[in-house]
Amino acid sequence: MRSSRILGIGSYLPKSLVTNDDLACTVATSDEWIVKRTGIRQRYIAADDQMTSDMAVEAAKLALNDSGINKQDVDLIVVATTTPDRTFPSCATIVQSKLECKNAFAFDIQAVCSGFIYAMAIADNFIKSGQVNVSLVIGAEVMSRILDWKDRSTCVLFGDGAGAVVLSNNSARNTGVISTILYSDGTLHNLLYTSGGTAYNGVAGTICMNGTVVFEHAIEKLSASIVEILNKNNLSIDEVNWFVLHQANIRIIELVARRLKIPSEKMVISINQHANTSAASIPLALSYAKNSGKLKQDDLVVLAAIGAGITWGVCLVRM
C-alpha cells in the first residue's frame, strides 16, 4: 500500500527582525506584557518588495536540497497561504515558475493557520492514490500586510515566514504520514477574520479577532483532536516523541499539554523566535526541531493546528 513520507524540510524567515521592544515604540505595549501573554519575543517582517512566493521558494529550495529530490521530479506543489501575492493567479503557480518545476501541477489551499495540515492531507492523498509520487507542501505568509499596526491586540501576535516539506511515495508500513483528521465549523467564522475581501469591499483589510473565545476553542479543539487521532491509531501519549502544535500562543500549547498530561519536554516550541506565522507555523516549528537536533528519523510526531473558519486539523507522522 502506498503512503507518503517526509524526505526533506526547509524554512525561511525574512531579514528584518522586529523585537517586542521595537513594537513598544509604536504601540502601548512592552516586552514583559507580550511575553507573559503569548511567549513571543520577536518576529520577522518581509521587505516591501518581498512576496509570499519569494519566501515560499526559499523554503522549498532548502526542503528539496534536504531531500535529495531533483526539482524536475516534483509532481505537485501545494501552497497553504492566506496572503498570496495576488488575488489570482495562485501563489503555487508562481512558485512553480520560480522553481522551474516544469512537471508539477500547482494550486493554493486557504485554511489560514490550519492550512499546512490541510495541504499535507491533500498531498498525502494524491500520493496514496497513485496520481503523484513527489509533492512539495509549503506554508507561506506575509501576515504583516494584513495587520493594523496600531492595534496592539493583533499586531504583536504575527510575523512573516515560510516553511516547506517534500513528501514522497513510501512503501514501508507504519512510516510517513500515518493518519490525518480535518475539521471545520463555519458557524464560528466571525471569531477571526479580515475586515476586507475581494467580493466584500475590494481591499485586503486587516485582522479582526475575538481573542478570548478563539483561545478557548483552540485549547478545546486541539486537545480533542489529538486524543481522537491517538485513539484512532491505538497509541498513547507515551509512544509519541514530539507534539508540534500551531505556534500561536505559548499559553495554548502549555494548557493543551497540561490537559492531556503531555510532558513539556515533548512539546516543540518556536513561537518565541518568529511569532504566529499562520500556515507557515507548523513547518517552521518542524524545521526548528530538526535543525536543533530534536527531531530524528523514525520519531513519531503529532502535528496539530487551528485557524480561522474555524478550521482545525491533526496529523500523525513517522519521520
From Swiss-Prot:
Active site residues of this protein: C113, H246, N276
Protein's name according to its UniProt entry: Beta-ketoacyl-[acyl-carrier-protein] synthase III
Pathway(s) this gene product operates in, as recorded in its UniProt entry: Lipid metabolism; fatty acid biosynthesis
Gene Ontology BP annotations: fatty acid biosynthetic process; secondary metabolite biosynthetic process
Keywords: Acyltransferase, Cytoplasm, Fatty acid biosynthesis, Fatty acid metabolism, Lipid biosynthesis, Lipid metabolism, Multifunctional enzyme, Transferase
Function: Catalyzes the condensation reaction of fatty acid synthesis by the addition to an acyl acceptor of two carbons from malonyl-ACP. Catalyzes the first condensation reaction which initiates fatty acid synthesis and may therefore play a role in governing the total rate of fatty acid production. Possesses both acetoacetyl-ACP synthase and acetyl transacylase activities. Its substrate specificity determines the biosynthesis of branched-chain and/or straight-chain of fatty acids.
InterPro entries: ACP_syn_III_C, ACP_syn_III_N, FabH, Thiolase-like
Reaction equations catalysed: malonyl-[ACP] + acetyl-CoA + H(+) = 3-oxobutanoyl-[ACP] + CO2 + CoA
EC number annotated for this UniProt entry: 2.3.1.180
Location of the region described as ACP-binding in the Swiss-Prot/TrEMBL record: 247-251
SUPFAM superfamilies with a match to the protein in the record: Thiolase-like
Top-tier EC class: transferase
Family, similarity comment: Belongs to the thiolase-like superfamily. FabH family.
GO CC term (a single one): cytoplasm
Keyword Lipid biosynthesis: yes
Compartments, record wording: Cytoplasm
Complex formation: Homodimer.
Domain of life according to the entry: Bacteria
One Gene Ontology term of the molecular function aspect: beta-ketoacyl-acyl-carrier-protein synthase III activity
Domain notes: The last Arg residue of the ACP-binding site is essential for the weak association between ACP/AcpP and FabH.
Organism, as annotated: Ehrlichia ruminantium (strain Welgevonden)
